Curated annotation (Swiss-Prot):
Binding sites annotated in the UniProt record for ATP: G375, P376, P377, G378, V379, G380, K381, T382
Function, in words: ATP-dependent serine protease that mediates the selective degradation of misfolded and unassembled polypeptides in the peroxisomal matrix. Necessary for type 2 peroxisome targeting signal (PTS2)-containing protein processing and facilitates peroxisome matrix protein import. May indirectly regulate peroxisomal fatty acid beta-oxidation through degradation of the self-processed forms of TYSND1.
Record's protein name: Lon protease homolog 2, peroxisomal
Domain named Lon proteolytic: residues: 651-837
GO cellular component term, pick one: cytoplasm
């Protein structure tokens, strides 16, 4: 047995103050440093740049360091441990701190504190004896007997540990090689002891006292291990398993305690799981995987982290609806009535749902279609999906995809990762409990993309009827049949949907509502819903249709009805205040009547409170019911109108025309303004325009320059070269909104023609269409939304490309009756329709028509 090599520490040591841990000589401890003095000590004495200094510290236990260095030091513990920092790791979260790995060297005693700031420094005296231990044992028999007794208990403890034979032999060699005088400190830091017991061992300067205090701790640990071995069930692989070197860090339990009851419950749960696996209707491949996992679970200790993961996996497998489904309601007549009651208009969408029901009647094993409702916000795309599920009698589940940027949200995480879980598809199936629900994939056009993968690519398999019968979630790692699920996606635009994903879905356009449709929706659905939410009845409030029309035209500007619904909510809140005040006034009037009757017999005291008299005098009658919401009440509640019809005012001078634009929020009218000035022939474009729109402007000016003589268009100097010493500025108002697309071509031509001819464009005309350099008008998209926007703005005539005439069939008949349409195949027809009296070709005087 070797002896301790002499350790000599400096007489002055910087002090590291710890509170919740005790460091013993020969042991290693990890501690966190976050107080002012300790941080200053680490930065000044341990760290030099990025390197670690070999500085001996004095670790003082059971002494909290004040949070501020302005506070005085608390009383210091008398005995500490000289230590060497092995590792220092810094961090700034949640606050600046260091984590130190320190090794104890020897004991010392504080003689005098030399300074307290910026960190404490003390004069110390080393306490551990440096004499050779064998020489001490020869001179003192009691110390030698204690040493031998301690060694025997230490060997017995090592042999009782649940470790392999080689590991036990290695620990035996370690005990033999360690100095005997170091064993009490080292084993005390390893076995289960409290900080109070460790502090007592630290204070035991004498070796005899140290051995005497440590032996009972070893005996207690040995008895606990014996009790644990009696209560444990023997296993075949006990001799092969290896646990951590630190022995038994938990209190041994007694038979019949809560731990035994929990173990019995776990065993019962495993039996139930095994029974569910045998009786489940899962496919053969999934059944094989579950049987294999349940066998692993039986052999696995409950303390292993993988035990809970495997159990959760098996519980999910038996809960999934592999073959459980609901029966569809295929009554087309009842479905039509239900859809009409829930939603007004949307004829195209309702027809597609009824077609699906009809085909399901003829073919039971029809694969679910993949529908995608595309339209502006607030038109009812999400609520239609819920109505479809209600019509079919199926379960409904909504999956919000807006902002999802991790493909694991769709496919799940592999079970090798910590915190793994299935994807949203499998989770949704577990939630609804059937394999043929209606899944609403909301906002599919707002999927993101990140380093974790592309969720839109993960949806390709889900939304492909030819592949989704074999969908494999990463967490399950077995195939699940999604062919019976009816997937409905919603989007505001198809522009941001990847082409491969768009190709897998059947696009159904859901356009915005007309004013008449909004009025019907308001009085059928919105107003009754708001009355119910605010506790009102139709006998208390009356909103005529002309008031609803005023709200639609002057307080909202949208394709859907969300803002309209909020306006009705504001009206109902204002009426609720009036109704509540009226009930309060009625009660006060009743009380005042009673007081007046009694006042005939009594005199009013002079010191009566004036508030009660004035309150009674100022009482007003409650409002008459029902409260009528007219234009005056509308202005009081909602304030001044937000939108005004300013079309005629803005077209009061040449160089202004009205175009029609399409946005994901629906159609809208767009003004185009032009002005000319002396310059060098430059064309300036403003209004946040895209490249396509800029090219349309250059096309328009080129066509007008080439046809200037034909229409007798001149600049301010009378020249047919429109850009000769002239600059042109084209502006598209709402400059904060980005604009792009080819459909503004005809509007730009009309605006510039008005500028150079000095004629006004008709104030009731709007137009849309793409142009070519030869003056042709090409078709554009979004005709229905654009026409509805023009109708909302009060325009009367719409100029559209001739090849878009077929799109007029989708426009409601009442809108078509209010508007007149001009279909144009070339710019000549556009100009003739945009100006009063047409835009005739100017013939050059003095020319004689040849008859040859």
């Amino acid at each position: 047995m070797s002896s301790v090599s002499p350790i000599q520490i400096p007489s002055r040591l910087p002090l590291l103050l710890t509170h919740e841990s005790v460091l013993l000589p020969g042991s290693t401890m990890r501690t966190s440093v976050d107080t002012a003095r300790n941080l200053q000590l680490v930065r000044s004495r341990l760290l030099k740049g990025t390197s670690l200094q070999s500085t001996i510290l004095g670790v003082i236990p059971n002494t909290p360091d004040p949070a501020s260095d302005t506070q005085d030091l608390p009383p210091l513990h008398r005995i500490g441990t000289a230590a060497l920092a092995v590792q220092v790791v810094g961090s700034n979260w949640p606050k600046p701190h260091y984590t130190l790995l320190i090794t104890g060297l020897c004991r010392f005693q504080i003689v005098q504190v030399l300074k307290e700031k910026p960190y404490p420094v003390a004069e110390v005296e080393q306490l551990d004896r440096l004499e050779e231990f064998p020489n001490i044992c020869k001179s003192r028999e009691e110390l030698g007997e204690l040493s031998e007794q301690f060694y025997r208990y230490a060997v017995q403890l090592v042999e009782m540990l649940d470790m392999s034979v080689p590991a036990v032999a290695k620990l035996r060699r370690l005990l033999d090689n360690l100095p005997r005088e170091a064993l009490p400190d080292i084993l005390t830091s390893i076995i289960r002891t409290s900080n109070k017991e460790k502090l007592q061992i630290l204070d035991a300067v004498s070796l005899e006292d140290r051995f005497k205090m440590t032996i009972p701790l070893l005996v207690r640990q040995i008895e606990g291990l014996k009790l644990l071995q009696k209560t444990r069930k023997p296993k075949q692989d006990d001799d092969k398993r290896v646990i951590a070197i630190r022995p038994i860090r938990r209190i041994p339990h007694i038979p019949g305690t809560l731990e035994d009851e929990e173990e019995e419950e776990d065993n019962d749960d495993i039996v139930m799981l095994e029974k569910k696996i045998r009786t489940s209707s899962m496919p053969e491949q999934a059944h094989k995987v579950c049987v294999k996992e349940i066998k692993r679970l039986k052999k696995m200790p409950q303390s292993m982290p993988e035990y809970a993961l495997t159990r959760n996996y098996l519980e999910l497998m038996v809960e999934l609806p592999w073959n459980k489904s609901t029966t569809d309601r295929l009554d087309i007549r009842a479905a039509r009535i239900l859809l009409d009651n829930d939603h007004y208009a949307m004829e195209k969408l309702k027809r597609r749902v009824l077609e699906y029901l009809a085909v399901r009647q003829l073919k039971n094993n029809l694969k679910g279609p993949i529908l995608c409702f595309v339209g502006p916000p607030g038109v009812g795309k999400t609520s239609v999906g819920r109505s479809v599920a209600k019509t079919l009698g199926r379960e409904f589940h909504r999956i919000a995809l807006g902002g999802v940027c991790d493909q694991s949200d769709i496919r799940g995480h592999r079970r090798t990762y910590v915190g793994s879980m299935p994807g949203r598809i499998i989770n949704g199936l577990k939630t609804v409990g059937v394999n043929n629900p209606v899944f609403l994939l909301d906002e599919v056009d707002k999927l993101g993309k990140s380093l974790q993968g592309d969720p839109a690519a993960a949806l390709l398999e889900v939304l492909d009827p030819e592949q989704n019968h074999n969908f494999t979630d990463h967490y399950l790692n077995v195939a699940f049949d999604l062919s019976q699920v009816l997937f409905i996606a919603t989007a505001n635009t198809t522009a941001t949907i990847p082409p491969a994903l768009l190709d897998r879905m059947e696009i159904i356009q859901v356009p915005g509502y007309t004013q008449e449709e909004k009025i019907e929706i308001a009085h059928r659905h919105l107003i009754p819903k708001q009355l119910e939410q605010h506790g009102l009845t139709p006998q208390q409030i009356q909103i005529p249709q002309h008031t609803t029309l005023a709200i639609i035209t002057r307080y909202t500007r949208e394709a859907g009805v969300r803002s309209l619904d909020r306006k009705f909510g504001a009206i109902c809140r204002a009426v609720a205040v009036k109704v509540a005040e009226g009930q309060h006034k009625e009660a006060k009037l009743d009380r005042s009547d009673v007081a007046d009757g009694e006042g005939c017999k009594e005199h009013v005291l002079e010191d009566a409170k004036p508030e009660s008299i004035s309150d009674t005098a100022d009482l007003a009658l409650p409002p008459e019911m029902p409260i009528l919401i007219d234009s005056h009440a509308l202005k009081d509640i909602l304030g001044p109108p937000l939108y005004e019809l300013e079309v005629s005012e803005r077209l009061s001078q040449p160089g202004v025309a009205i175009g029609l634009a399409w946005t994901p929020l629906g159609g809208k009218i767009m003004f185009v303004e032009a002005s000319r000035m002396d310059g060098e022939g430059q064309l300036t474009l403003t209004g946040q325009l895209g490249d396509v729109m800029k090219e349309s402007a250059h096309l328009a000016i080129s066509w007008l320059r080439s046809n200037a003589k034909k229409y007798h268009l001149t600049n301010a100097f009378g020249s047919f070269d429109l850009l000769d010493n002239t600059d042109i500025h084209l502006h598209f108002p709402a400059g904060a909104v980005t604009k792009d697309g080819p459909s503004a071509g005809v509007t730009i031509v009309t605006c510039l023609a008005s500028l150079f001819s000095g004629r006004l464009v008709r104030s009731d005309v709007a137009m849309t269409g793409e142009i070519t350099l030869r003056g042709l008008v090409l078709p554009v998209g979004g005709i229905k939304d654009k026409v509805l926007a023009a109708h909302r703005a009060g325009l009367k005539q719409i100029i559209i490309p001739q090849r878009n005439e077929k799109d007029l069939e989708e426009i409601p008949s009442n809108v078509r009756q209010d508007l007149s349409f001009v279909t144009a195949s070339c710019l000549d027809e556009v100009l003739n329709a945009a100006f009063d009296g047409g835009f005739p070709v100017k013939t050059r005087p003095g020319l004689i028509d040849s008859k040859l």
